Amino acid sequence: MFVDIAKIYVKAGDGGDGIVAFRREKYVPAGGPAGGDGGKGGDVIFVADRELNTLLDFKYKRHYKAQNGERGGPNNMHGKDGEDLIIKVPVGTVIKDAETGEIIADLSREGDRAIVAHGGRGGRGNSHFATSTRQVPRFAEVGEKGDELWVILELKVLADVGLIGYPNVGKSTFLSVATNARPEIANYPFTTKYPNLGIVYISEGESFVLADIPGLIEGASEGAGLGHQFLRHVERTKVLIHIVDVSGSEGREPVEDFIKINEELKKYSPELAQKPQIVAANKMDLPDAQAYFELFKEEIEKMGYEVYPVSAATGMGVREVLKRAYELLKQQKAAENVEEDAKPRTFVYYKKKDVKPLTIRKENGVYVVEGTVVEKVARNIVLNDHDSFRYFQNFLNKLGVFDKLREMGIQDGDIVRILDVEFEYYE
């Protein structure tokens, strides 16, 4: 089974908590705060690996989580950072944000990396909060949460040469003769629902990957049938072998078949129609094909294409087509800047986060304060003593929260809520 799309959940590690600690050595009589910072959470990183060729594993495991950072230690010891989670995917995998559809990365080269979820920052230990007026801070920060998101993995098969054509023209039979692949072969539309891959061996040290691209139909570029799925797999091939049933056994006209398929390629992507294309006039073992071949060959050659008579059922002419495809493939690869393409790249994705402005509303007698900045501080500071609460109050005052509360008519003893933190207001 070839699996080319998967949806998975990834979660970066949370940052470790900072701690409250003080120096207690015998010869340090006035030991100050010495709480260490928490470690950073691990990132989630996708890496392209040419040893893989399907996304099948992601159908069975859909949740992935990187390691959390560790808590800080005494004597300003920094907590250990969480290990990054490396997720290997086949070369040719496109990663998208499932919520927005935004393309995060196109991992088309061996070793390409994409950092899609960033680990949370470690919380600061109490030594960071010492001031001239607060020399013994008894509070610290908790670590920040790591990024989390659902992503869609989409594999565009990386075959060198693709077999294209209408359903039931003999592509799967051609592939089975050309390689050791054993595709499902039957006489019905959409016989091949996933690309079948095989290795074609030309001679020692000379080979290429051949893919049977699922059958196209008229309207595929608009998504008819399984059109978009099928056309997606053609994009990465360098050479196309266009299989045409020259016998007309399916009740269609061979030249029209050829023209319609190329029109669909051009509509979907003009670049596809420009790829080198060999035409294999298949089913030459049938009498009708032999009678029609010369006329077909003449019409197609007028359009500038090479035509080869073949019979996938008997193997006749298949080897000649494969050798010619390999020659064209070498020409295409030589034309590319191989050195530049070989360098792996790193993609870094930061999911856009909604920034909420500071707002205050009265709800059932409680003043509810909301906003990205104020909520972040309320979430990160452990409010468990006078020092930490005083720090929090000073922060709210600098942010202008208390001024706005007074404008709204707050009275002593009224309740203020920020996230799950509630306190009574007093001047």
UniProtKB/Swiss-Prot annotation:
Which residues are listed as membrane-spanning?
none
Q: Where is the OCT domain?
A: 347-427
Question: A GO biological process this protein is involved in?
Answer: ribosome biogenesis
Q: Name one GO cellular component term.
A: cytoplasm
Annotated GTP binding lies at 165-172, 190-194, 212-215, 282-285, 311-313
The entry's Mg(2+)-binding residues are S172, T192
List the Pfam families hit by this protein, alphabetically. Answer: DUF1967, GTP1_OBG, MMR_HSR1
- Taxonomically, which superkingdom? Bacteria
Q: Which SUPFAM superfamilies does this entry report, sorted A to Z? A: Obg GTP-binding protein C-terminal domain (SSF102741), Obg GTP-binding protein N-terminal domain (SSF82051), P-loop containing nucleoside triphosphate hydrolases (SSF52540)
Q: Which UniProt keywords apply?
A: Cytoplasm, GTP-binding, Hydrolase, Magnesium, Metal-binding, Nucleotide-binding
As cofactor, the record names: Mg(2+)
The similarity annotation says: Belongs to the TRAFAC class OBG-HflX-like GTPase superfamily. OBG GTPase family.
Identify the residues that the record assigns to the Obg domain, covering every copy.
1-158
Quaternary structure (record): Monomer.
Q: Which GO terms describe its molecular function?
A: GTP binding; GTPase activity; magnesium ion binding
Q: Which organism is it from?
A: Caldicellulosiruptor bescii (strain ATCC BAA-1888 / DSM 6725 / KCTC 15123 / Z-1320)
| Cited InterPro entries | G_OBG, GTP-bd, GTP-bd_Obg/CgtA, GTP-bd_prot_GTP1/OBG_C_sf, GTP1-OBG_CS, GTP1_OBG_dom, GTP1_OBG_dom_sf, OBG_GTPase
Q: Does the keyword Hydrolase apply?
A: yes
- Domain OBG-type G, by residue range, is 159-330
What's the EC number here?
3.6.5.-
Provide the protein name: GTPase Obg
